[in-house]
Amino acid sequence: MPKLKTRKAAAKRFRATGSGNKIFRRKAYKNHLLYHKSAERKRRRLSGLALVSEEDIKEVRLMLPYL
């Protein structure tokens, strides 16, 4: 049986925790068009990592078989 391929675009966007139970992602809307967003919004709501929701974990695991 051949090896499963990893979706490289997804591999750059998701990371697993040490135990592998949870998957992290970056928050959206912080790449461009930032001048009209307040510093508070960028710092508090858009910074840091977020967990992938339970509903989406199955799809992420299909894209990343060796995660």
UniProtKB/Swiss-Prot annotation:
Q: Which domain of life is it from?
A: Bacteria
Q: Which PROSITE patterns match?
A: RIBOSOMAL_L35
Gene3D superfamilies per record: 4.10.410.60
Which residues lie in coiled coils?
A: none
Pfam families recorded for this chain? Ribosomal_L35p
| Entry's Gene Ontology cellular component terms | cytosolic large ribosomal subunit
Which GO biological process entries does UniProt record here?
translation
Q: Does the keyword Ribonucleoprotein apply?
A: yes
Similarity comment = Belongs to the bacterial ribosomal protein bL35 family.
Know the name of this protein? Large ribosomal subunit protein bL35
